[in-house]
Amino acid sequence: MYIPEHFAESRLDELHRIMRAHPLAMLCTSGPQGLDANHLPFLLDADSGPHGRLIGHVARANPLWQSVAPDSEVLVVFRGADGYVSPNWYPSKHETHRAVPTWNYEVVHAHGTLTIHDDVKHVRSVVARLTHAHEAGEPHPWKMGDAPPDYLADMLRAIVGIEVHIT
């Protein structure tokens, strides 16, 4: 992605802040059928590796987990805040009329390698961590133990864990 130098952000803590604030990201992969994009919630594990690690899951019915080669390079795109900027907002527009519209946005492109985890124990851990993170702000957070055990077991068998080691 082209980023003008004066807009580039390289502070890892700021990149991680955006990723945490906007966890629904687009996982871009390339497989035998060509390019693919999946919109998935991710949890950032900032302490894993020099740049962190992303964990999540996909439906077992999603061909992603079988079509992408092990340790494939992937791109995960986190979209933050964005908005239109009118030329009318610039004082110079009223003086010189030398202004044009633009769009301001924040986005993080996390490059990494994809690992698939077809293991119920791993998937249970991923779901527990995602649930804990996303239910934390709820007045009465849902817990995995709130679901009937047989139903939860069926749901866990229907998903596959994914992990992206950010490079």
Residue ranges and their predicted role:
Residues 1-167:
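Binding-site signature for planar aromatic cofactors or substrates
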